Each structure stands twice: as structure tokens, then as C-alpha cells.
Amino acid sequence: MNEAMKREHMQQLMDPDAAQPDVRLVRMYESLCEACAKRPEGLNDQDQMMVADITTMEKLKQQLYEDIRKRGVVEDFRNGRQRMMRDNKSVQNVRMLMDQQRKHLAELRLTPNSRKAAPVSLDDGFDDF
């Protein structure tokens, strides 16, 4: 694991109201890095950056959940004398983040279906030629 990169990622996970990163996000970051390191190809810098993206998305997702708790799934909207109900855009954003997290986890081969797939072989036989 690249320790300098890890320190940078921990700074990104800092809670603005606290002096240290969110413990739950740190645990998530470390467990995903550990799971990547156990793979046959190990953990490289690109994988570590993707893990940081996943944990940052989790942080954003929690903020969106808080907004949904406060304002609800639909919100009252007023335009002059008109009053309407409209969808809370946080719901759509949470769905997008969840899909992106799923794609990142699949790319890291950390989902059950992605583990079943055969690993991509980069050996084209040129070395044997």
C-alpha cells in the first residue's frame, strides 16, 4: 500500500466538523484495500485510488441520505401562488452513486459475480516468440 497516497486519502475523508476522518469510512477504506491486496494481482496505486473514490462516494451518499431524511423523497415546491410536489434530487443522486460504487467494486473484482469471471490475461504470447 502506498502510504503517502493513504495519508492524502485520509485528508479527503476528513469530516469538516471534526479534526480526524470518519472512523467508519477509514475502516471501509482499509478493509477494501486489504481485500484488494488478497487478490492474486495484489493492490496497486490505481486500485488504491479507486478504493478512495468508493469511500468518498460513501461519504457523499451519507450526506444525501441525511438530506432525504430532512426533506423527504418528494418536496413541496412553490412558484409564486402555485404549489407543487417535486422529486428530491438527492434520491436520483444516491442511485447514481450506488451504481458507480458497484461498477468500481466490479472493476476491482470485489463483487461475487466479478470474482467468478476469468481474469483478463495480458499475455499475448509474444515473449514465447
Please report, for each region that a protein language model flagged, where it lies by residue:
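Alpha-helix capping/hinge segments and adjacent helical runs
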Residues: 15-16, 92-119, 127-129
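Extended, surface-exposed interaction regions
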Residues: 1-86, 90, 127-129
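Low-complexity, rRNA-contacting terminal tracts
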Residues: 124
